[in-house]
Amino acid sequence: MAKKALIIGASSQDGSYLADLLHEKGYEVTGTLRRSTNYTHPNIEHLYGKINIEFADLLDFESIARLVRKHKPDEVYNIAAQSVPADSWNMPFYTAEISAIGPVRVLEAVRQFHPEAKVYQATTREILGNIEAESANEDTRFDANNPYGIAKSYAHMMTRCYRESY
């Protein structure tokens, strides 16, 4: 039986590469799109008919929970985010809802409805602030200096908290 993966944010650059990779490895892939996104998704058009496409929104717990209940994925990848640091200053509430609280909605949906699933939460170097990338490692202190980096720091820490608690 094929492994099942749920990719939240499948139409993003990284999400589409991941969907390609997992499909090639024989996974049954479900990728999400937001209803408010463009009607064309050039990054994943070549996968239409090969992967399942569902609508979900990180602002809406029920849309995520519905997919976890329906597909019972072995692996859940949250690639979605408001991922432009400069824009995070103009949209701090939206950035926090999508990039900080949205991942908690994913974690909670998995905890409540399919706790066997493994969760991958995408992160960014922005959690480290103005550090030189060559000098960073797993022990480097978080020092985010914009709303996007702070939101992703929260998501990272909540993912660790859920992993250690559940």
Q: Model-predicted segments: where are they?
A:
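N-terminal Rossmann-like NAD(P)+-binding domain of SDR-like oxidoreductases, especially those catalyzing
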Residues: M1-Y166
